[in-house]
UniProtKB/Swiss-Prot annotation:
This is Apolipoprotein N-acyltransferase. It comes from Pseudomonas aeruginosa (strain UCBPP-PA14). It is a multi-pass membrane protein. It is found in: Cell inner membrane. SUPFAM superfamilies: Carbon-nitrogen hydrolase. Keywords: Acyltransferase, Cell inner membrane, Cell membrane, Membrane, Transferase, Transmembrane, Transmembrane helix. The keyword Cell inner membrane applies. Catalyzes the phospholipid dependent N-acylation of the N-terminal cysteine of apolipoprotein, the last step in lipoprotein maturation. The active site is at E269 (proton acceptor), K330, C382 (nucleophile).
């Protein structure tokens, strides 16, 4: 098995395969032990490698992970961006090759500055710290791409009890630590004290996760809210067709009018497919309907802001009418779907760079939450719900979470189900109920433990009825966010860096 840790193609191909295991640990498959196996194979494959070889070993791992785990991007480019098969394949491969460097550069840093082969316990801790740093970096760099985090595999796994304590970050840290410790355990057998400490580090977090699973960190803030969520199932090719606007508005109106004994009616992202000011009459009429039902109607709608120079800015928004108030403007935009980077160069080259409604501006920070039926509602539009820290900041001020989306762009791929899993994790992290309304699925109600209690299947029109309970109180994660864990990771990385620099004087510290 030494070939795994040697430079060359056999090790690189194993890293590619190990990376491709990543999506199998996540939704919709959820074979969560594969997350540990995947990372363990990468850790073993980096042992003893020089910097350049480690960089390419990490790159191949990343190519496997993103190539398999974000293959739904091809669907968006080909099916809805009108790109030919060769062009869509080229763009998909180019994207995958680029984001694979998220793993390549940390692998190089590990080999050059942090790895200590003669300190198995300290090495495992430093590797887990670097893994956490990588996931944090991915959530921020170039607006972020926080997809395929290892911690999502534990949504309903043994570590679920740790998620309200440290978020998906703590789950990822423990998985990476467990993977490295399992690789290093054979080296600890001759050393009784080190072996005992290694077993405590390996088994302790899993025992804590099981012990805390189901613990109630938050409690009810009032009576249950009766919710109706509408899933219109509008085909993407009809979504922005001007000739289909009236039909879509009539559909959502007609599905909502018969609903009785309801507190919240929720429509998906851009369910109103025209600008808010152009739909003012329609929204006003629906607000009157909601008032008559003593309910609030919350819908996605694009928003126009007229500027002093006569120009306009456009936003992806959510607005409330009836028994509530507020309009929220999306802050985390999807590249190419909602804005085009370098648009002066790319606009018009191919249809994918000129999609409908792909010229949105970013909403301002520190917007007030939505208000409905006397409660604060934390809004997330589509992609925003995948950002743990961003979501936590809003959740801490709220009693109910709301996410609206249009995942039609991703067809029958695994993308929408990965997206749903991340939304479930936000509910678990915050200890709050979440309402999720989508155009074509999965629309659902998620409880504070991340479990789906009501849902409408994908690709069908439907009306979901259920109840959510407004919650108050803060989980440890909402109180402290990632900072305690990030501080620990920083100490571990500094320790590894100093230990590496002082290697001649090091005396098997931690190992």
């Amino acid at each position: 098995m030494r070939w795994i840790s040697r430079p060359g193609w056999p090790g690189h191909l194993l890293a590619l395969a190990a990376g491709a295991l990543t999506p199998l640990a996540l939704a919709p498959f959820v074979y969560w032990p594969l997350a540990i196996l995947s990372i363990a194979l990468l850790y073993l494959g980096l042992r003893g490698l020089p910097g350049k070889s480690a960089l390419w070993r990490g790159w191949w791992y990343g190519f496997g992970a993103f190539g398999a785990g974000t293959s739904w991007i091809y669907v968006s480019i080909h099916d809805y961006g009108a790109a030919s098969v060769p062009l869509a394949s080229f763009l998909m491969l180019g994207f995958t090759a680029g984001v694979a460097f998220f793993f390549a550069l940390p692998a190089w840093l590990w080999a050059r500055c942090l790895r200590r082969d003669n300190a198995p316990l300290g090495d495992a801790l430093a590797f887990a710290a670097l893994w956490l740093a990588l996931e944090l970096f991915r959530s921020w760099f170039l607006t972020g791409f926080p997809w395929l985090y290892a911690g999502y595999s534990q949504l309903q796994g043994p570590l679920a009890g740790l998620v309200p304590v440290g978020g998906v970050w703590l789950s990822s840290f423990v998985i990476a630590l467990s993977a490295a410790l399992l690789v290093n355990l054979p080296r600890l057998f001759p050393h009784g004290a080190s072996l005992l400490l290694g077993l405590v580090l390996l088994l302790g977090p899993w025992a804590a996760g099981l012990y805390l699973k189901g613990h109630a960190w938050t409690h009810s803030a009032g009576e249950p809210l009766r919710v109706v969520a509408i899933q219109g199932n509008i085909a993407q090719e009809l979504k922005w067709d001007p000739n289909q606007v009236r039909a879509q508005l009539d559909l959502y109106r007609d599905l909502s009018l018969p609903q009785q004994d309801v507190d919240l009616i929720v429509w998906p992202e851009t369910a109103v497919p025209i600008l808010q000011d152009m739909a003012s009459g329609y929204l006003g009429a629906m607000g009157q309907v909601a008032d008559e039902k003593n309910a609030a109607l919350i819908t996605g709608v694009p928003v126009r802001e007229r500027l002093a120079d006569g120009k306009s800015r456009y936003f992806n928004g959510i607005t409330v009418v009836g028994e509530g108030a507020g309009t929220y403007l999306k802050q985390k935009l999807v590249p190419f779907g909602e804005y085009v980077p370098l648009q002066d160069l790319l606009r018009g080259l191919i249809a994918f760079f000129d999609l409908p409604m792909s010229d949105f501006a970013r909403g301002p920070a520190d917007q007030p939450l939505l208000k409905a039926k006397g409660y604060e509602i934390a809004p997330y539009i589509c992609y925003e719900v995948v950002y743990p820290e961003f979501a936590a900041a809003l959740a801490a001020q709220s009693q109910v979470l709301l996410t609206v989306s249009n995942d039609t762009w991703f067809g029958t791929s695994i993308g929408p189900l990965q997206h749903l899993q991340m939304a479930q994790m936000r509910a678990l992290e915050s200890g709050r109920w979440m309402i999720r309304a989508t155009n074509n699925g999965v629309t659902g109600l998620i409880d504070p433990y991340g479990r789906i209690v009501r849902q409408i299947p994908q690709f069908q029109q439907g009306i979901l009825r259920g109840e959510v309970i407004p919650m108050q109180g803060l989980t440890p994660y909402l109180q402290y966010r990632v900072w305690p864990l990030a501080g620990l990771a920083g100490v571990l990385l500094l320790w590894a860096l100093l230990g590496r620099q002082l290697r001649p004087q090091e005396r098997r510290l931690f190992g």
